[in-house]
Every structure is written in C-alpha cells, then in structure tokens.
Amino acid sequence: HYPLRRQRQMCIRDSNKIERPAVPLPIRLSAIDPICLDILYNRGIKTPVEMEEFLFPSLTKQLRAHPPLLDMDKAVSILKAVVANKEMVTIYHDYDVDGVTAGVTALSALSQLGVPVNHYCNDRITGGFGINAAGVDEIVAKFPDTKVLLTVDNGIAGIEGVSRAKELGLKVIITDHHEPGAKLPDADAVIDHKRVDESARQDKNCCGAGVVWKLMLELYIGLGRNVEPVMDLLDIVALGTIADVVPLIGDNRAIVQEGLKRINSGARPFFQMCLEVLEKESIDAMTVAFRIAPMINAVSRMGGDASKLIDLFMETNADDLRAGIIALDDINEARKEETRRETELAKELVGKAPVGAIVFNHESLQEGIVGIVAGQLKEEFSLPAVVLAKDKDGNWKGSARSPEGFMLKEALDQCAEYLISYGGHAKAAGLTVRAADLDKFKEKLTKLALEAAGDKGFEVAIPIDAVLGAQDYTEDMVRHLGILEPFGEGFRQPLFGLIADNITGVRYMGTEEQHVRYQDESGLQVIQWNKGDEAKARKAPPKKFVGYPGLNVFRGNTTVQFIAE
C-alpha cells in the first residue's frame, strides 16, 4: 500500500557527484556562472561543444541534422498543386493548445500562398479526439468545395475517418505526432515521426504544431518562396510545443528559444494583449505553461468551441482581443474551481491508500477536465491514475496520467480487449472503457502497475541539482540561471537544496496566513506557498529547503527569494 502523500526526499543524483573537469572554455561559456555549467554537465551535456549547442541552438542546423520526414515529398507535391489551382483545403485540428496552434500554423501559411482555407474541430465531449467519419461528413456539408483534408495534431489513428474522406473523393494529408497503431490510415500522405519505418536519425519529439510547421517550411522551400512568413509562425509553434509537454531538446529547444523571442517582440497582437491582461512584463516558458496554455485548454474543457480560438489568435483589433483574452481567463478560473471540487471528490472516494493504479469513475465528473484531475491524482499518490466520466452511450470515457517508471501506452495495449478506443503516449493517454468491462480493466491495469512498481514503488525523490548555503544565492547567480531557459519537459527548472542554519524571522502572508516567509540572516527570503499551517505547527524553522531562487522587484528594489516546496 502507498500512503496518501509519500514524503519526497531531498537527494542528489549519483551523476551530480561528478565534478566537472577543468577544460578551456569558449568565450561565451567562460562568462557564465560555473553553477550553470555544472548543472548542464550533470544532466549529460558534458563537452563545451555540447553546452554551446544546447544553450545557443541553431534551428537551421537542427533541421539539417536529420532527413525529411517520410511522405513529406508526397504532401508537398499535393499542396503545390493546391497552390497552383487555388483548391480549397480544410484543416482538421484538435481542440487542445497543440491542435489549435497547429491549426493556426497551417491556416496562416496556406492563406499567405493564396489558398482558400477552412478549419474544423471536433467538439471535445460529443466528437472525441481525432478525425472521424461524422466529422468528415460535416466538413463536406459545410465546406463542399474542399479538395484536400489536412489533419494536424491528429489522424494517425483515424482509419475510419480517412476512409470516409477517400470515399468522398478527398485527398488526405495526415500530420501527427501520436503513436501509430499496427495499421496506418489509407491517406495520400502520412507524416508522423513516430512511424515505425521512420529514420532512426529523425527527431521524434516534435508536437503537432511542430510537425505541420515543418511541412509548411518544406512547401515554401519547394515553391521557391521566401520562408520568412513560416518563420514568423514560430511564436505560435513555441506555444504548442511548451503546452504539449514534449521534451525541450533538439528541434524543440531551438523552436521554443526562437519562438519566445518572437512572442516578446510585440509582433503578434495576441501575445501583446496577453502581456497586458496578465500584467506581465515578458513571457517565458513558465508563463506559457502555467498561464496562457491553461486558458486556451479551458475553452474545450468547459464545453466551448475550440475552433473559435483560431480566429482569436489572428485577431488584430485591440478591444476584441482584450475582451477575448479576459473571457479566456474567466473560463479558466471556472475550470480551476470545477477541477478543485472534482479532485477532492476523487480523493475522498479513492481513499488514503490506493494500490497499484488509481482508476476513478463517477457519473458527476465533467468529461472536459478528467485529464487535469488524473494529473493531480498522479501527483498526489505517485501512481498511474485514470479518471473516467460516463459518455452518452453509457461507457466510461476519460484520461490517464502516469509517473516515471510506468509506460502508459504499452499498458493500455495490454488492456485493449476492454477498451473501445484509446491512444496517447508513455505518460498521458485518452481512452474509452466498455461499461461491462470496467472492473476487468481496473483489475488488469492495477496488476500491470504493481508489476512495474516492484517493491520500491514509482520514483518520487526530488533530483536536486546542487545544495548551497543561503549566502550563495546572489542576484548575479539567479540572473545567470536564466541562460538555461527555456525550462520544461526534458529540461526541468533547476532544483536546489538550501541549507539555512540562521533563520532570524518568520512572517505569515495571505488573508488566512496560509503562506509563510522565512528571513535568513544573509538577507535571503524563503517563501513557502500554502504551508502556513505546517509552519505554525513546527517548534522551530526548518534548516533544509528544496526549491529554486528568483528575483523579487518591489518599489525599485531587487531582492533574492527562494521559492521552497
């Protein structure tokens, strides 16, 4: 059995005990705080050349490092004819951030070539994920002049939907990044870096927006056009890349670095208005991940029409943009409250000691936010979590999330006999369980999770990058850490251990004193959110913390803060 909240231990990876060898450094590296280089070294980025390529990636060089994706030539050939003949393309996109940004990417790039373009998105609740026959029929009815159907961030599992499109005489191009099944859809081109026959040299980490962006780039190059309009879309692609939690390495890191520059350049009115509404001076990867992306995802989660988001991204009127983004923020706040209620219900019904895997189903659950609830249960219990809501057919439809050490997609493959449909990755998946087989599914998944966990359970120790004293956290050190950005999946924000032997003051913050601030004699402030009650119960302030340093600017004065768990 696993307790409700296993205490996460402050530990240092074995690799962090390796001292970085003293070697001559290029000028750009020699100017960086050594702690940054130590972090890179102990994360496997060891040589000066590797460090420079990681910190200062060249997107052009990254793209040239691997061959074009399979069927890219076929797709480009079809789209060249579309451009020449001004044939209508309808984009079939997903309803999450990656799907929406992939839709914006394709629509913008094709529109600038004079192609008549429409876009279509399933309703999250009634239509489900990916191209299907009903969606194709609706497209043909709504956009009868459609000649080419372009899927973005979906399609690799859409055998039925693609078959229907072909029956109706449409050409179909699939661009996707999800895991394929044993059989590929019968499309005219299937672009997915996870195809089993793809090159081993291929970068297999791109999100849906990244895949279709590469197609648009190849199209412009093939047409002999200036590629700057495609490069201008990197801000949109960066948003999709960060939001879809794909590893920020390789192509993705270069895309996000360049994309964040463009986001903060002021070129796109949407992001300029985000700065105003969210009261931010700049937008980094963390702002995208925890503020902007959730607002966009909230629309479909709360039953809204995600296809309208594409129009908002392309809006230029300041008043309409402001109203639109404020509305997104309001929807997201409602989503947060609904998520809080449903997560509390789940924890109450699951109990304090779930075994193996959590499979939680309840008729009151809102289908649009089951993925978030699953993610919170996974974090709370450090176990694979599946959360299911009853669908219109009486079956159980929902989402799954998994901690390190449990390959979710592979586990679902072994449970396929109980599932009507499923798809996803190692850490996240969507699925529909046949009502009659729910108990069998729970039993099978729990058994697989117990086997994977073994005696030790799933890893919950915090990998600390360095342990420092309070006096070591200086303003210069914190500013230098910024060069390691962007942080995200595959390259998380550095975590530090803080040894604070000389706490001189404690102050409680918030309307209910729910937060606490410790003052070290060095001047360093240690902030813990929502830990006020724990702090009051202590006989003395803690001497060890885990977290990350940051800068606080108040009335023109800059101080260093340590944000602790």
Task: Label every PLM stretch briefly.
Residues 466-524:
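Accessory interdomain/linker segments of ATP-dependent helicases and helicase-like nucleic-acid enzymes
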Residues 522-537:
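Beta-strand/loop nucleic-acid-binding surfaces
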Residues 437-444, 512, 538-565:
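OB-fold single-stranded nucleic acid-binding module
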Residues 40, 150, 297, 481, ...:
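A residue-level signal for conserved active-site and pocket-lining positions in enzyme catalytic cores
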Residues 160-164, 358, 373-376, 476, ...:
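A short acidic, amphipathic alpha-helical/loop segment
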Residues 21, 26-147, 167-168, 186, ...:
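Hydrophobic helix-and-loop "lid/oligomerization" segment in the mid-to-C-terminal part
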Residues 137-205, 209, 213-222:
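Active-site cavity-forming subdomains of large catalytic enzyme subunits
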Residues 1-14:
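Single conserved hydrophobic/aromatic residue that forms the stacking wall/gate
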